[in-house]
């Protein structure tokens, strides 16, 4: 089933072959990481580009009021019949496309385990920021953030 992913991010966190952050945050312009205008995943992931497992730094300033909180669009996934929007108050999200899933026993006995057969959108802090002295919380300090996953039937579906 074809689907597209849009992530309004101007930069991403580069990772090495072990999927560890390098500390570099390149611009997405002109790269497979440019998902600002939506990309079909079947076209984006191929022999030359093995898939996504990166943190995207959101560039959207279009805040949305939701239950008294200011949230921004982090991602939108459009399938044939359904659409999903992800809203957050964080500065980015990790996008993963099941690069390391191997054919094997089905999940829960009925969902096939297929490479690139799943995607994950996780809002939160950038991986590896503790190396930069960020992302620490004191004992007893409360940490909260808000993420909303909204799934709807596509109205423009023929």
Predicted regions and their residues:
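An exposed, glycine/acidic-rich loop-and-rim segment of catalytic or binding clefts
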Residues: 1-158
């Amino acid at each position: 089933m074809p689907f597209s992913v849009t992530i309004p991010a101007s930069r991403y966190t580069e990772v090495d072959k072990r999927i560890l952050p390098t500390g570099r945050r390149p611009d997405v312009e002109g790269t497979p990481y440019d998902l600002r205008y939506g990309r079909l995943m079947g076209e984006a992931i191929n022999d030359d580009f093995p898939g996504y497992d990166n943190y995207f730094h959101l560039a959207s300033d279009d805040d949305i009021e939701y239950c008294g909180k200011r949230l921004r669009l982090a991602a939108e996934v459009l399938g044939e019949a359904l659409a999903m929007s992800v809203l957050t108050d964080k500065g980015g999200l990790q996008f993963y496309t099941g690069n390391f899933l191997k054919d094997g026993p089905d999940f829960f006995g009925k969902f096939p385990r297929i490479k690139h057969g799943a995607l994950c959108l996780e809002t939160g802090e950038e991986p590896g920021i503790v190396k930069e002295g960020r992302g620490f919380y004191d004992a007893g300090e409360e940490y909260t953030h808000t993420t909303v996953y909204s799934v709807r039937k596509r109205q423009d579906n023929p």
